[in-house]
Amino acid sequence: MPDILIIAGPTGVGKSGAAVLVAEEIDGENVSADSRQVYRGLVIGTAAPSPQLQKRVPHHLINERDPREVWSAGAFASEAAGTIEDIIARGRRPLVVGGSGFYIRALTEGLFEEPPADPGERRRIRARLRSRLEKEGSGALHDELARCDPEWARAVAEADSQRILRGLEVYELHGVPLTDLQEERQSNPPIVARWCTVLLERDRKDLYDRLNARVERLLDAGWLGEARSLMSAKVPADAPGLTGLGYDLLFDHLLGRISFDDTVEGIKQEHRNYAKRQLSWFRAMDAHRIRLEPQDGPEKTAGLILDAWHRHRKP
């Protein structure tokens, strides 16, 4: 059974740079467990590892899928398991790196198996929910989700119509919250390993300060131009790859609906909200928790991760 390291933590905590240093130390390759970095054309806005970092260490599941495609936890778990097996077969060590606690759970524990339901009833519910989404918007449906499955709603962005509809569909079909079914009906994980999960944490003020600075940095790096290119390619603002990170606000700004200053402040708020949702998944995660200080950079972080890894591997 292989030992596999997972480096987890909310967006902006400092995973990418440290993960490259760790991979260089243990002859590893990084497998992204990020629900947005997998999409093509979102390199700047998702703060994907830079080309310089990717030259130093091979990265997988980054910049691979069309942003119009649905990329689910199940798809990630299957792809990641195959990638991990290939890395091991080549004599190297896989590192799973990312901020999606749901994706990490799907890989390490498996996904829930939904009880059977009448296909016709499922189609009717799905069509009715989609019609409501078009008429009422995702915010109204998110409010409804919060009433029937508050735990799932806390982990889902208000703009993430795909996951909102999924939660409401399951509740209408079975009368049980999706999160309850996930606890009761786990399937087998796609790969069996001795997982060493290291969770990076920061004081909330420190994390939010880092996120605010990151948004400014991404805009300076050309994020608005990246959004303009997506618009030119006819990628809609509600495409699966664009939810919850600020692309919708950049689209609104490019269409003259919102000022640049309001766009920037709105994006910063979206990033803080996204980090809150990630943290809700991490609270219950079984992991080696590393509390980082504001001055801790990639080198210090990598050293702490390696200490946890070496302790994990001791007989």
Residue ranges and their predicted role:
Residues 1-315:
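Phosphate/pyrophosphate-binding catalytic cores of soluble transferases and nucleic-acid-acting enzymes
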